[in-house]
Amino acid sequence: MKDFDLLNIKCPHCGGQVEYKTYASINSKSDPELKEQLLSGQLFRYECPHCHEKGYLGFPFLYHDPVNHILIQYTSPEKRDETLKTFIGNIAKAKEILGNEFDKYRYRLVDEFGLLCEKISCFDNGLDDRVLEITKILVGYILEQRNQINDEERLYLYDAGDHLRADIINQNVKTMKQIKINKEIYNVAKRDYSQYFDEEKTKFAIINEEWAATLLNKISKKN
């Protein structure tokens, strides 16, 4: 049985009470249906039983992938620093109790839903999220030169077998376009930049485009 909490929230449309389920953690192996609801966005959606208006409400939780040895803490941007401290503390306590079992894990903190889905897909397909973030910067530059992306759009990359799929999303106007990307860009990024990864520091880290841009800037200054 899955552990969840029931919250009573007020419908923003009619003011009626709505019961809303939240989960403290999701295990991709034991809760595959919850994982599917997460990736589809259904996990955060609700329908008011009174006016039948539908809404969306996120909540923090821990995503646990025991197969690929991944722990991802999802939180809001406003609580990122606070959550990071708590996350680090909880992992340290778990290591004291369970010992070497957690040594093989990678730990990530994510404060944006699109990035969470991208990371789950990344690890499910055996990719390295550090390489993928660098690849996104390279792909983003190419798309900018072709006028296929602008400053209001976000880029996400997904493994699609023989190529990468670029999802370009504009949250302001709720639009998305998809573009095929040559997978060789990822392979080149892995070949050229993996040597600069600090394996110990990036075992537990916030890996995003900001992290990748900082790393590329350091590399350019060295060279």
Model regions: which residues?
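Short acidic DE-rich linear segments
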Residues: D3-F4, W211-N223
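Long, contiguous alpha-helical scaffold regions
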Residues: N68-E210
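N-terminal cysteine/histidine-rich coordination modules
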Residues: M1-E78
